């Protein structure tokens, strides 16, 4: 886990392993890089706990969802259907003001 602060913004990057809420309280990042690897599914309410303790960040970018050890041209559709879409939909339920941004490899995007 890392917290990067620059100007008046902050980015919190999380893996997909457990955490202790009191260690994250008050961080309130503008951007949360949320690890959504399958290992988090065995942890009690991981997604909900993470989003809530970080103050329902305005922007959430899922990471660790792809099969990263295959060529870039390899289809990630199974991971999109099995990991990204369920995560995006769940975040929409628990934090409707948060925007889930799904990056595309080697494509730039701007966060306002």
Give the ranges of each region predicted by the language model.
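Core dinuclear metal-dependent hydrolase active-site scaffold
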Residues: 1-26, 42, 107-112
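Binuclear metal-ion centers of metallo-dependent hydrolases, dominated by the metallo-beta-lactamase
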Residues: 53-112
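Conserved short-loop catalytic and cofactor-binding motifs
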Residues: 20, 35, 75
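Active-site neighborhood of phospho(di)ester-bond hydrolases with catalytic His/Asp-centered motifs
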Residues: 12-17, 32-37, 60-65, 102-105
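Amphipathic, non-transmembrane alpha-helical secondary structure
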Residues: 21, 47-48
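Active-site-proximal segments of metal-dependent phosphoesterases and phosphodiesterases across multiple
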Residues: 27, 31-46
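Short, conserved loop/helix-junction motifs that constitute active-site signature segments
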Residues: 25-28, 50-56
């Amino acid at each position: 886990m890392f917290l990067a602060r620059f100007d008046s913004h902050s980015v919190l990057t999380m893996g997909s392993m457990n955490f202790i809420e009191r260690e994250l309280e008050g961080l309130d990042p503008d951007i949360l890089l949320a690890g959504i690897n399958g290992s988090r599914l065995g942890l009690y309410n991981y997604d909900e706990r993470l989003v809530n303790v970080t103050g329902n960040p305005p922007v959430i970018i899922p990471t660790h969802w792809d099969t990263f050890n295959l060529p870039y041209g390899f289809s990630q559709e199974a991971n999109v259907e099995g990991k990204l879409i369920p995560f995006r939909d769940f975040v929409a339920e628990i934090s409707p003001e948060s925007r889930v941004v799904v990056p595309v490899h080697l494509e730039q995007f701007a966060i306002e």
